[in-house]
Amino acid sequence: MNTLPKLHNATWPGLVGKGPDSEPVIAFDQLLEMTAAAEVGGVKFDGIDVGLLEPHIYLDQTEEAKKLAEKVSKHGLKVGSLVAPIWAGSAMGTADQRKTFVEMVRKSCEFGQQLKALGVRDYGIVRIDSAAGVSDWAKDPLGNSKLIAKTFQEAADIAAGYGEKLAAEGEICWGGMHSWKHMVELLEMTDRKNVGFQADMSHTFLYTMGYNAPEHRILPVDADLKDREVIKAAIKTVSDALRPWTIDF
């Protein structure tokens, strides 16, 4: 009998795109309450995936993991994947920026291990990206991809010491990861057993449309997006390429 994948709600939509000039931030406690209460056809969330981002999570506070564990346990939830706040650095930046990137991964892995010790995290990855723009990457595509891969390798070695896997999220906005082909190339360059791909399904679809990388477009410009067979064929091309690397959705 197959075991169904664990179904988790993400906390970072409560922060991303929100703030003083937009919609208000959704408080972490409110997100937990909504997650625990949600139910469709008898199916409920098993847990949450947590963005280690302020004001939801203060990564440098010593009691933060304990407070989080108490909150999720109260609602009968588990913690799964974690989003490392790597944007204070960059995987293809200066030496100091790359050092900051790796340090943020280390802190995230340590936090994840604390949650495991507290009994609320039994699975999940640590999510990363290149923390670099597409236009900056395009100034030296090969050189920058090699530098990103080197940073990912350093971060992977740190993560391995904590028993963690890193997953690069396939988003079109991150340099070196902005097309399905570049994503595969970067993963091959990185070549670490504990580094894989996290599929964001909307961005995976955008891969097929060649956003930020028209040369890697699969769907024709005039494709009928109501034609499910055309869509399925395009997604299959992307899926076939990235499936060997995919460790999180």
Annotate each language-model stretch with its function.
Residues L166, F197-Q198:
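Residue-level marker for buried hydrophobic side chains located in beta-strands
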Residues Y58-L59, I172-E185, H203-P214, P220-I235:
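Active-site glycine- and acidic-residue-rich loops that bind
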Residues M1-D122, L142-K146, K150-A160, R192-G196, ...:
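N-terminal pre-domain/capping segments
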Residues A10-G14, V50-P55, A84-W87, A131-G133, ...:
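Active-site beta-loop-alpha junctions enriched in small/polar residues
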Residues E23, L147, W174-R192:
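Short, motif-level signal for alpha-helix interfacial/capping segments enriched in acidic residues
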Residues G112-P141, Y162-C173:
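Active-site groove signature of glycoside hydrolases
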